[in-house]
């Protein structure tokens, strides 16, 4: 069978098409309702829930890919776990899973299937993505209320300082969500400025450990650990992360592992139920702060009735 030719398009036309569409979208997103810093599982859930309710949402992600650590379930194994009742989120995403024979209420799914479905659902809902873009600071208003973020291209940070004198730019928003995981970069910046008391970060500073500043290519790189949170305790950590999710500073909501770092909570390791439900609770906190009338977000689904 013969193949019909592709459309006759020049290289310049391809470049203009990319640049025009990207530029128009970026200009449209310079002033938005909610900026979510970090495109891991909690940030993606927050973005999905808000976008489904008509909120203008932009995800700012420093990597070229979304999903954070949700691609793998620990030790380079690509099976992820959630504990009851977080499997309800997998149901919403049509992600298949099985109950483990290790414990009742422990469910296992394929990481790539789960994270790709979550990314698709957030994008389908209308969330916009600015990837390869790094948070560098916050935009502040009266009484240190956060009114946006300062950002730059991720590669700028990777180049030697003597080669890069590249000013960042600022974008405005009604709310900023810190979904940056262990590093809690938005809240860490506010703590550094002395305008927010974060127990976990303060504890790290008092004990002279500080937050993790190792380079991305060094052992102990950001994202692997943080002295802001406590050591692993799965059963306690997940409940507390969801419980403490919400507004942490005027204009700022924290979700996911950023909550553990801010509050000094235990880490939970490779189980993701708290990330998913924290994302839902964070979205509801945003709706409340925005004063939006919308269908409430159920982050504590009831157990199904017995047949």
From Swiss-Prot:
A Pfam family recorded for this sequence: Thi4
Please give the function described in this protein's UniProt entry: Involved in biosynthesis of the thiamine precursor thiazole. Catalyzes the conversion of NAD and glycine to adenosine diphosphate 5-(2-hydroxyethyl)-4-methylthiazole-2-carboxylic acid (ADT), an adenylated thiazole intermediate. The reaction includes an iron-dependent sulfide transfer from a conserved cysteine residue of the protein to a thiazole intermediate. The enzyme can only undergo a single turnover, which suggests it is a suicide enzyme.
Reply yes or no: does the keyword Transferase apply: yes
Record-listed 2,3-didehydroalanine (Cys) modification sites:
165
How it assembles, according to the record, is: Homooctamer; tetramer of dimers.
* UniProt binding sites for NAD(+): 42, 61-62, 69, 167, 257
Q: How is it modified after translation?
A: During the catalytic reaction, a sulfide is transferred from Cys-165 to a reaction intermediate, generating a dehydroalanine residue.
Q: Which family does it belong to?
A: Belongs to the THI4 family.
Name the pathway.
Cofactor biosynthesis; thiamine diphosphate biosynthesis
Cofactor dependence is on: Fe(2+)
Q: Where does glycine bind?
A: 267
Q: Where does Fe cation bind?
A: 167, 182
- Gene3D superfamilies linked to this entry: FAD/NAD(P)-binding domain
Q: Which GO terms describe its molecular function?
A: cysteine-dependent adenosine diphosphate thiazole synthase activity; iron ion binding
Its UniProt entry gives the catalysed reaction(s) as: [ADP-thiazole synthase]-L-cysteine + glycine + NAD(+) = [ADP-thiazole synthase]-dehydroalanine + ADP-5-ethyl-4-methylthiazole-2-carboxylate + nicotinamide + 3 H2O + 2 H(+)
- Note the superkingdom of the native organism: Archaea
Q: Name one GO biological process term.
A: thiazole biosynthetic process
Q: Which InterPro entries does the entry link to?
A: FAD/NAD-bd_sf, Thi4_prok
What is this protein's record name? Thiamine thiazole synthase
| Alphabetical list of PANTHER family matching this protein | THIAMINE THIAZOLE SYNTHASE
> Per its UniProt entry, what is the enzyme's top EC class, as one word?
transferase
Extract the ranges annotated as region (Disordered): 202-232
Keyword Transferase appears in the UniProt entry: yes
**Keywords assigned:** Iron, Metal-binding, NAD, Thiamine biosynthesis, Transferase
